Design a protein with these regions (language model features):
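Beta-strand/loop-rich accessory regions of lumenal/periplasmic or secreted enzymes
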Residues: 149-150, 154-457
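Extended substrate-binding grooves/exosites of carbohydrate-active enzymes
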Residues: 1-158
């Protein structure tokens, strides 16, 4: 729907508005001939905005006269914490009792003028030849030539069966869970939850929940029902409370097979995981490693979309440095920078998009190889099936429950997610939901990955 702005003496302009706007037939005919502006077609609150390519495709229409993303900058202010540190803050942090929220932190850049990951994705859709974008892509490809070549060689090296049980690259505990890789304690969990983004918490009317890709309307239509956010639906389904039950452990031919079931409490749906663990060597003279094959088989009726399907590894220590092959910039199914692939490098603590309120914001797609270096040596991840990844010192639940980064615990650990998929980001904080084409839908899938600890000298 649209209304006609006739305030200009020379040209009337059609301005799209809420789908429920009342427009008479005569005005509608004039609107169809007028130039049009897309007002607040995307909203830049939190992780995002996403979905820009769909709107960029509309801009070649001869009547199109421009559009606006809301908005340019986060409205956050410095606050001095009791320990003397300063933090960007909002709402009730300054005694505001009525409007305590981070909804004024909705900029393409933060309060210090630093672009968010979603901003680069938006630029890539709207102005792919922008010099600033070209510089950002080059800067993200920060790994050295030597690191690039080494990871490429590792990713392409054949695996050799490892028969030396005295130097096993892994151990399982009595319940069939991975207890260590190399001599490093490691915990692996299934994850189908993420810390809700501001868009996941959005309650606007452009909601695609339950709509599949075969029943799509035009951009910005959806269900037309406001009120319930994806975050509320995921919480109601208790996706953050998955529980594990061991089914069986078998061993034969050098392979250990573990079958387990995961489900939320009191749910009539869940997933059966079948793990196969085998010791291997990366090349004839390379390090010992663990080959992991995982079959994911959902049962029951899952929610129509889930935040993610992935593995969460917990590693000791927090001072890790990452080098990887794959997408070098943060991205999601509906929020990415085409061409930003190569060899990235950076401290693990710097690989998350830090919005004012903690939320999901560190996913990178298309992982080919990952090296994490810390006090315990090097931790290698070599995927043999499509995976995205992210790292954070905090779990999904800890991020979801925190209102500020300074509220999070200071613990010596690192979480590494290896994701089969994540739900799209969308822009539903004040705009359209994630489109069904990029929805996270639980499904049967096989995952294959090689994991190794390379001990330091």
């Amino acid at each position: 729907a649209a209304v006609l702005d006739d305030s200009d003496l020379h040209a009337e302009v059609a301005v799209p508005t809420h789908v429920a706007a009342q427009v008479d037939d005569a005005a509608r005919e004039r609107i169809r001939r007028a130039p049009y502006l897309m007002c607040e077609y995307l909203h830049a609150m939190g992780t995002g905005p996403a979905g820009a390519p769909g709107y960029a495709a509309q801009m070649s229409h001869p009547r199109h006269a421009g559009g606006f993303v809301w908005e340019w900058r986060d409205h956050a202010l410095w606050r001095t914490l009791p320990d003397g540190r300063r933090a960007l803050s909002y709402g009730g942090d300054f005694g505001e009792e009525v409007h305590d929220g981070n909804f004024v932190c909705d900029g393409l850049v933060d309060a210090l003028s630093r672009p968010y990951a979603g901003t680069w994705a938006w630029v890539a859709a709207m102005a792919p030849d922008a010099p600033a974008l070209a510089r950002a892509i080059v800067e993200a490809d920060s790994g050295s030539v030597g690191e690039r070549d080494r990871l490429r060689a590792l990713a392409e090296t054949d695996l050799v069966p490892c028969a030396d049980e005295a130097d096993s690259p892994y151990a399982l505990d009595e319940s069939g869970r991975v207890a260590r890789i190399g001599d490093m304690p490691v915990r692996i969990d299934l994850s189908v939850f993420r810390a809700p983004t501001d868009n996941d918490r959005g309650r606007g009317p452009v909601d695609y929940w339950g709509i599949d890709a075969s029943n799509l309307g035009p951009l910005g239509v959806g269900r037309g029902e406001a009120g319930t956010s994806h975050a509320m639906r995921w919480e109601h389904a208790r996706l953050h409370l998955l529980r594990r039950r061991l089914v069986s452990i078998e061993e034969g031919g050098g392979v250990r097979r573990v079958v387990e079931r995961w489900a939320p409490p009191a749910a009539q749906f869940g997933v059966t995981l079948t793990w196969e663990y085998a010791p291997v060597r990366i090349g004839e003279e390379g390090p010992n490693a663990l080959s992991v094959s995982l079959r994911v088989a959902p049962y029951g009726t899952w929610p129509p979309r889930v935040p993610r399907l992935g593995l969460r590894l917990e590693l000791p220590g927090s001072a890790w440095h990452a080098t990887w092959l794959g997408d070098t910039m943060i991205g999601y199914a509906d929020m990415s920078v085409p061409g930003a692939r190569g060899c990235g490098s950076g401290d693990a603590c710097d690989l998350w998009d830090v919005c004012v309120r903690p939320q999901e914001g560190g996913h990178r797609q298309g992982l080919e190889a990952l090296s994490l270096r810390g006090e315990a040596g090097e931790f290698l991840i070599l995927p043999a099936s499509p995976l995205g990844w992210s790292v954070s010192r905090w779990s999904e639940r800890e991020l979801a429950q925190a209102s500020h980064w300074e509220d999070l615990p200071d613990l010596e650990r690192l979480f590494l997610w290896l994701d089969v998929f994540q739900d799209g980001i969308g822009t539903r904080s004040c705009g359209p939901d994630t489109r069904p084409e990029v929805a996270g839908r639980m499904r049967d899938v096989d995952v294959r990955v090689v994991i190794a600890q390379v001990r330091g000298d």
